[in-house]
Design a protein with these regions (language model features):
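N-terminal small/polar loop signature for handling phosphorylated ligands or for N-terminal nucleophile
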Residues: 82-138
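Oxyanion-binding "anion nests"
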Residues: 233-271
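C-terminal active-site/capping subdomain that shapes the small-molecule cofactor and substrate pocket
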Residues: 269-362
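N-terminal export signals
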Residues: 5-27
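C-terminal segment of N-terminal export signals and the immediately downstream linker at the start
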Residues: 21-58
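Conserved anion/nucleotide-ligand pocket segment
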Residues: 167-235
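Short, acidic/small-residue loops that bind anionic groups at enzyme active sites
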Residues: 131-153, 161-168
């Protein structure tokens, strides 16, 4: 049987007023019990977005483009004092990047915070974040990819619902913009994610009892395991979820709906990271359901020496006997739907849709 490889979607690869700096407050390192959930206030046109780089730096051109994108959404933009600082592949030292986050949460004139990009380095700054202060100054925090480490930290340590969504360097096309607004600005009681409006995306097809890679139709997601489940949405980038496993910032997946995306990792690496989350009884084996995004550019270069991505996903996840879908449009793809981290939702894998059960912002 002929197997097609995944066809990679393209990922999207001004001035502002500085504000007074605050010294970063180092975490006491205590493993906090799960804090009571806090849902931040919605964003509105005219609000001020704080733009920062908690991982890899932005170039001046990327910064200008990011500011323009946010202004086109109707926001005012203020970027962090350390925005254009570089330290190798990082956007400044760990303490500088943490300081930017702490002071943006503390600044009452900042209504929401968006990351300029991902890259690498978010996990390094977790010990320097003041989670008590952040909890007392809740506001939307938005990002994905390497920013998964911060989504874990904010939700687990401060109880703050945050948002796996586009960043400054993202492509604000119709779908990305629509779901950003539906989640963060114009919340609905039961927002449905089902790819109905999506142009062709990557998917998986079932043929002769096995999974085969295909181009999906505009309405297609793939059911790996049918069924329905409810739970809080948590998740993010698989590499970061794996990195955080066993740390004080890790999250229990018991009865959660776990969403996962990845980019540029070979099938054996996907296998290894999923296996790590399977070997812990409080991780994927305890989950209520799994929502997989598009695993962009994750097929083997030489498929004769490798399992396909499809085979890995089927082998590792089908045996859990919980609902699993593949292909929801989020992650390292152009049409990147915003997912609220910590909001209750219902997964209907048989019908290939995800529905929020509460408003994602207050």
């Amino acid at each position: 049987m002929h197997r097609r490889k995944f066809i990679s979607n393209l990922s999207a690869s001004a001035s502002a007023l500085p504000f007074l700096g605050l010294k970063p407050t180092k975490s006491d390192g205590h493993l906090h019990a799960m804090a009571e959930k806090i849902i931040p206030e919605r964003l509105q046109p005219g609000d001020t977005i704080g733009l920062l780089t908690p991982a890899t730096y932005l170039t001046e051109e990327q910064l200008r483009n990011a500011v323009t994108a946010l202004e086109n959404l109707g926001f005012k933009v203020r970027y962090s004092p350390n925005m254009l600082v570089r330290k190798g592949y990082l956007g400044g030292t760990d303490k500088q990047r943490a300081e930017d986050i702490n002071q943006m949460f503390a600044d009452e004139e900042i209504d929401g915070i968006m990351c300029g990009r991902g890259g690498y380095g978010s996990g390094r700054i977790l010990p320097y974040l003041d989670f008590d202060m952040i909890r007392n100054n809740p506001k939307p925090f938005i990002g994905f990819s390497d920013i998964t480490a911060l989504l874990y930290g904010f939700y687990g340590q401060a109880g703050l619902v945050c948002y796996h969504g586009p960043m400054g360097t993202s492509d604000y096309n119709e779908i990305t913009t629509s779901y950003f607004k539906k989640v963060l600005m114009e919340p609905q009681n039961q927002l449905v994610y089902d790819n109905q409006e999506i142009k062709p995306v990557l998917g998986l097809d079932v043929e002769e009892g096995e999974l085969e890679v295909e181009m999906a139709s505009p309405t297609q997601m793939i059911t790996l395991t049918p069924g329905q489940a409810e739970g809080e949405l948590i998740g993010g980038n698989l590499s970061l979820m794996s990195m955080l496993a066993g740390t004080q910032y890790d999250l229990d997946m018991q009865e959660k709906l776990v969403f996962i995306e990845e980019v540029g990792e070979a099938p054996y690496r996907i296998d290894r990271m999923l296996t790590q989350l399977l070997l812990d009884k409080n991780k994927l084996p305890a989950a209520a359901g799994i929502v997989l995004g598009v695993f962009n550019a994750c097929e083997a270069e030489d498929e004769d020496d490798s399992l396909s991505l499809a085979q890995v996903l089927q082998d590792r996840l089908a045996g859990l006997n919980i609902p699993v879908i593949y292909g929801l449009s989020f992650g390292h793809i152009k049409q990147n739907m915003t997912l609220p981290f910590g909001i209750n939702a219902r997964l209907d894998a048989s019908e290939k849709k995800l529905t929020l059960l509460e408003k994602p912002v207050a």
